[in-house]
UniProtKB/Swiss-Prot annotation:
Name assigned to this protein: Deubiquitinating protein VCPIP1
Residues carrying Phosphoserine: S746, S756, S767, S993, S997, S1076, S1197, S1206
Pfam family, one: VCIP135_N
Ranges of biased composition (kind: Acidic residues): 1198-1208
EC number assigned by the record: 3.4.19.12
Keywords associated with the record: Acetylation, Cytoplasm, DNA damage, DNA repair, Endoplasmic reticulum, Golgi apparatus, Hydrolase, Nucleus, Phosphoprotein, Protease, Thiol protease, Ubl conjugation pathway
Length: 1221
């Protein structure tokens, strides 16, 4: 199935609505490449197939074959979506969506790997529940959680019960980010190993590395996922491991006394604790001894794999960990067979992150071939056959087929959630959302779950937590405490406005959505979050934000759309609506009613429900009437008559001639798409709640961008109008702050490679004051190894001496490497010889023996390392530049598409959005990336043909450049300003001198930016060098009037029209032929330009030069003929005098509209010959000047340089007077 070609920059608008399609045609619509161009532009909708999500998704029929759900974060194939149907009226949706995208209205942040939900569960959610699962179980009868000791199962969950379980991933989840295949680089690192496994399994992919979070617990996360598919048992595994080591410490010490010192066991046991915080100088991270312990805890083998090169090395990077301390008969499942091994692996050469390898549900169980089965670790090799059932070919089956059912897992999670709510007063899913929106999105990493839980609980109790009904993001109403204290922003504002603050008054700050009271004792303002309300979402800026309760439920207002799906009704949005504590399929209809009793007249509005799928929710006319009468006339005698009248009135109002008439009350925020926005068009059966545009340049746009009420439009318009002023102020402020602060490159910003999970075994920063001794394992490249104890103050040279004593290797032959990946330990710099080495307890260093090398070797190695570092910096910069380019492509493509939908060209639409030409705007960014920003620098954009722009540094923006009138700020009325300025220039052209003619002053547009006036340029300028030069008009006649030459020099810098509009034609192919060596830059899909206009193909320069020669030769020939015709009537002396007079008169102010050809402009990737024309009289004068000059050069070989006027020192060929080569 071939992918469709990428969309052009300016696609045509969507087609008119079509008739509803059949199910078969809709299925075909979801397949790219199977439809005509007309149908490929349709927008389809479908539901997420996850039963816990089922969000409505909208996507173009010609887009990507996979769709990412913006609710749960999973990515699904189009054919997997449920209920695929065509959206017949996407115009308004696309308009609002693209407009919001261009205005920078972002949706909720994309879910990271911890927050992607599968079956309603995210990784972070499971981590929060894991401590509870270590102490609680689920009663099979009631499905409720109970303490394990109350169920007579001990204090701690026995992980051996999971010894025969194995996780098999569903095929549809293999590519789900954060749940399926690992994306930290392991697929490349383990490629050869996985290929060998694939060949051993009949070339079928049946064992894949899957994701686990790198938060310091990756080993137990990997084991937990290999067992049950979730990170639910990491806490129990750590506690089981610690208890196991404590109970069997004597056996472990006896077994590993040759490998592990007795003093190390205390650290090994402490590292198993879930809350372990390492002391200074002690590494954090579970090691091989812990994997061996886990194998004994689970009563099953654990196989650790590595890349093929790592498995073949002498290091113990791969091994088979057998439950050697457990009798083999206890390592069996319920069927009596040995528990099959589970498999984990290193994810990279750094060997600092474990990942599990699991099988695929529905495929054959994976088999590990004999050549990949590592040696047993810590026990005799013959025990492998005792604990692992080997196949006939020597391999073994991984995992098994006894998986924990999803239904049971979800029931278990639901039971544990109740315990979490009882313990903390807040739902774990709400804590997970707080972590996502308030910590991860702001760059705060490593915060303990207990701290996040406490912060979330306090925010709920203070009524500061709000949820957006449009994008689902959490927002916090938070004000810095320092703003409320004396000297703070809000405190000073209240005092300057109200004078002396009083404790019996409330002070409102509308811009901060805050109401405060005053505490005279502490002299501070106290925020009252009960009276304060957040008015807009911090992420999508939508106005439908509501408070959140501790259980995760939302405090809805009447009319709000809830998350409950609606199966019927006339509303059309697909969701139920909240009204007076209940959820309805439809919004109510509203009509006025008048009550008259006892001389009183009361007007009231009745809200009527009539089309509910649950009949009990439909309004009862007698109940409604009784409530109205009781509300306004309580206890009135004889009010039953009034009730009867009200009943008749309501029945009359609700009795419709057409049962399909449905006019619900209009409430902002009730639907993703407003009824008023449709403008009388027929509503589709299910209005979009979100839409996803995908394709070659994937951009996800969220449902909140489809929802714009009148209030939102007003706010957005105000933002747009004030954007330029605010950007200017912010820019000036940043400039002031950045003055005197040189830009530095932080080494921490340079990464070794892409990784979706941080390294797990982190080490505490080294401190030379550490009092503990450090035990370092040293290995040499010839196979020797030893454990060396170093003091905390050991220096580099003392380390070298220790190595020399231990291995008899002279210091000058030692190349010491440490860390993962190994890096060379360099000698200290001068003056720092007494500094301790940066080695920590438990580190392993390798010694490379330098054969036949002098002591100068380390300097060479340092130079090599420096070179590699520079290469890494270059690669990092390249990646960053690529990301910026892709962002500019997306914005430019959206702009072109939106302009087409609005029926305008790009310039007509873009000039109405001036912020695009200011800092942060798409055109500003393109110029900044492509050419760089310099005051007065000009540029053009392929999407805005015929327009030239100039950068104004004082205002920090791009302005429209009109040669004859000057520079103008971009705005909706810029064309009117240009016309007015041009007409004014034309009116003044006859009354003022040419020296004051409106132009760029002394500067003109050139290929590299700015070209100086002719009189200021250097002599002998080469064509197309980026400097302007004219065709040359200074006569070589020494008797010419000097005033005439001076006037010519002044006139030459003025701007004129292009030669392409005159009788002299230029061929476009000559100027668009780009050099193969030129650096092409893509600034939008399908559009390329050149980074520097000066890098032009010499062939193009030669072609342009020849055309200039032909042009001048034609003018000269015409003039020679004219002179021959007049030679019979005039004497040679008269002819010379007439030529001088002609040149003098032709350059007087007011006689010419344009000057002489001067500069060549190469911008925007298209080479344009920007020269200037004259009328026929000027052409004749030019010819006369050239002829006179040619003759004068023949007669006088010596000429003053200033009279050459940028021509060559000598003209060697009279037929080519303009040869500038």
């Amino acid at each position: 199935m071939s992918q469709p070609p990428p969309p052009p920059p300016l696609p045509p608008p969507p087609p008119p609505p079509e008739a509803p399609q059949t199910s078969s045609s809709l299925a075909a619509a979801a397949t790219p490449g199977g439809l005509s161009k007309r149908r490929d532009r349709r927008i389809l909708s479908g539901s997420c197939p996850d039963p816990k999500c089922q969000a409505r998704l909208f996507f173009p029929a010609s887009g990507s074959v996979s769709i990412e759900c913006t609710e749960c974060g999973q990515r699904h194939e189009q054919q997997q979506l449920l209920g695929v149907e065509e959206v017949t009226d996407p115009d308004v949706v696309l308009h609002n969506l693209l407009r919001n995208a261009l205005l920078g209205v972002t949706g909720a942040p994309k879910k990271n790997t911890e927050l992607v939900k599968v079956m309603g569960l995210s990784n972070y959610h499971c981590k929060l529940l894991s401590p509870i699962l270590a102490r609680y179980g689920m009663d099979k009868q009631t499905g409720r959680a109970k303490l394990l000791r109350d169920m007579n199962q001990g204090e701690l969950f026995d992980c051996a019960l999971l010894g025969d379980r194995a996780f098999l991933i569903e095929p549809e989840h293999v590519n789900t980010v954060g749940y399926g295949k690992d994306r930290s680089g392991s697929l490349l690192y383990l490629h050869d190993t996985l290929e060998d496994i694939k060949r051993a399994n009949k070339s079928q992919e049946c064992l894949i590395p899957v994701h686990v979070d790198g938060d310091g617990h990756c080993l137990v996360h990997a084991v937990s996922r290999a067992l049950v598919g979730r990170e639910l048992f990491w806490h129990a595994l750590r506690e089981n491991l610690k208890q196991h080591f404590q109970q069997h410490l004597a056996r472990y010490q006896a077994l590993f006394h040759d490998f592990i010192d007795a003093a190390e066991w205390e650290d090994i046991i402490n590292e198993c604790d879930p809350l372990f915080v390492p002391p200074e100088g002690v590494p954090l991270g579970l090691r091989n001894i812990h994997i061996f312990g886990l194998a004994n805890v689970l009563h099953r083998p654990i196989i650790l794999l590595d890349s093929l090169s790592g498995m073949r090395s002498s290091g113990d990077y791969s091994a088979t960990f057998l439950p050697g301390l457990i009798p083999a008969e206890k390592c069996t499942g319920r069927d009596g067979h040995l528990n099959k091994p589970i498999c984990i692996a290193w994810s990279s050469s750094g060997r600092n992150h474990y990942i599990p390898l699991v099988g695929i549900k529905g495929a054959a169980l994976p088999k590990l071939p004999m050549n990949l089965l590592p040696k047993a670790w810590g026990v005799p090799q013959d025990l492998i056959k005792k604990y692992i059932k080997l196949e006939e070919d020597g391999g073994c089956v991984i995992g098994g087929d006894r998986s924990l059912q999803d239904k049971y897992l979800l029931r278990l999670v639901a039971a544990m959630e109740e315990v979490f709510m009882d313990k903390h007063g807040i739902h774990p899913s709400l804590v997970a959302d707080v972590h996502q929106y308030f910590y991860r999105r702001t760059g705060v990493i490593g915060v303990q779950p207990e701290e996040v839980t406490a912060a979330a609980k306090k925010a709920v109790m203070d009524n500061r937590l709000h949820k957006c009904l449009l994008c689902g993001a959490l927002s916090e109403l938070h004000v810095p405490p320092e703003w409320l204290a004396p000297g703070g922003k809000l405190y000073n504002l209240a005092k300057s406005t109200h004078g002396q603050l009083r404790p019996d008054k409330n002070y409102s700050f509308p811009l901060n959505n805050l109401v405060c009271s005053y505490d005279p004792v502490k002299d501070v303002l106290l925020p009252d979050y009960g009276l304060s309300n957040l008015t807009a979402c911090n992420w999508c800026h939508g106005t439908s934000v509501r408070r959140v309760r501790g259980d995760g439920s939302i405090v809805y207002l009447d009319g709000d759309r809830t998350n409950s799906r609606s199966t019927g009704g006339k509303c059309g949005c697909g969701f139920k609506h909240f009204w007076e504590g209940k959820e309805y399929d439809n919004l109510p209809e509203a009509f006025p009613i008048t009550l008259e009793w006892g001389g009183r007249v009361v007007r009231e509005t009745v809200y009527w429900f009539q089309y509910e799928s649950d009949p009990s929710l439909n309004s009862n006319v007698y109940d409604v009437a009784m409530k109205l009468v009781t509300k306004h006339f309580p206890g009135e005698f004889g009010s039953e008559i009034l009730v009867q009248k009200v009943v008749h009135t309501i029945l009359h109002q609700t009795a419709k001639k057409n049962p399909d008439d449905y006019t619900p009350v209009n409430i902002d925020g009730a639907h993703a798409q407003r009824i008023g926005d449709v403008q009388g068009q027929e509503l589709e059966s299910q209005l979009p709640t979100k839409i996803i545009l995908t394709g070659q340049k994937t951009k996800t746009l969220h449902k909140e961008e489809l929802n714009m009420s009148k209030t939102e439009r007003t706010i957005q318009q105000n933002i747009t109008e004030q954007a330029s002023v605010m950007q200017k102020r912010k820019t000036e402020k940043l400039k002031q702050e950045q003055k005197g602060q040189p830009r530095t490159v932080s080494p921490s910003t340079i990464r070794d490679g892409p990784s979706s999970a941080p390294a797990t075994p982190t080490k505490a920063p080294y401190s030379p004051t550490t009092s503990k001794e450090k035990k370092i394992r040293i290995t040499t490249n010839d196979g020797r190894q030893s454990m060396v104890t170093l003091k905390s103050s050991t220096t580099f040279f003392e380390l070298q001496e220790s190595i020399a004593r231990e291995f008899n290797i002279p210091p000058y032959l030692q190349c010491i490497r440490y860390g993962f990946p190994p890096k060379e330990l360099m000698p200290p710099q001068a003056g720092m010889e007494k500094e301790p080495v940066p080695l920590q307890h438990g580190d392993r260093i390798t010694i490379e023996i330098l054969k036949g090398k002098a002591e100068g070797g380390p300097s060479t190695a340092a130079h090599s390392a420096h070179t590699v570092r520079q290469e890494e910096i270059a690669v990092t910069g390249k990646l960053s530049s690529k990301e910026l380019q892709e962002q500019a492509d997306k914005e430019m493509y959206s702009l072109c598409l939106l302009a087409t939908l609005m029926g305008e060209d790009v310039w007509s639409y873009a000039k109405g959005l001036p912020h695009m030409f200011q800092q942060g705007g798409v055109f500003y960014n393109i110029m900044k990336k492509t050419m760089g920003m310099a005051d007065g620098k000009h540029c053009t954009f392929p999407h805005l043909p015929g327009k030239t722009f100039v950068y104004n540094a004082s205002e920090d923006r791009l302005e429209l450049c009109v040669d004859a009138a000057g520079h103008f700020p971009i705005g909706p009325d810029v064309e009117d300003l240009v016309k007015e300025a041009v007409s004014q220039v034309r009116a003044e052209a006859t009354t003022r001198s040419r020296e004051s003619s409106p132009s760029h002053g002394l500067l003109k547009l050139g290929s590299g930016g700015v070209v100086k006036k002719k009189s200021e340029q250097l002599h002998n300028v080469t064509a197309f060098q980026g400097k302007g030069h004219s065709l040359g008009t200074a006569s070589s006649n020494p008797h010419m009037d000097p005033r005439a030459r001076e006037t010519l020099a002044v006139r030459k810098h003025n701007t004129g029209t292009d030669f392409s509009n005159s009788s002299i034609k230029t061929e476009p192919p000559v100027f668009t032929a780009a050099s193969s060596n030129s650096e092409l830059i893509r600034i939008a899909p399908g559009v390329v330009t050149m980074r520097d206009g000066r890098q032009i193909d010499p062939d193009v320069v030669e072609a342009q030069r020849k055309k200039l020669q032909e042009m001048v030769s034609s003018i000269q020939a015409s003039m020679d003929k004219h002179l021959r015709d007049q030679s019979t009537e005039q004497t040679p002396s008269d002819l010379s005098q007439r030529k001088v007079e002609a040149v003098s008169s032709s350059v007087r102010p007011g006689n010419l509209q344009t000057g002489l050809p001067e500069s060549f402009s190469l911008t925007g990737g298209t080479e344009n010959l920007n020269t200037e024309t004259t009328d026929s009289r000027v052409a004749d004068v030019l010819g006369a000047a050239f002829a006179t000059r040619s003759k004068a050069q023949k007669e006088n070989s010596m000429e003053e340089p200033e009279e050459m006027d940028s021509q060559d020192a000598e003209t060697t060929n009279t037929t080519e007077p303009m040869d500038h080569s």
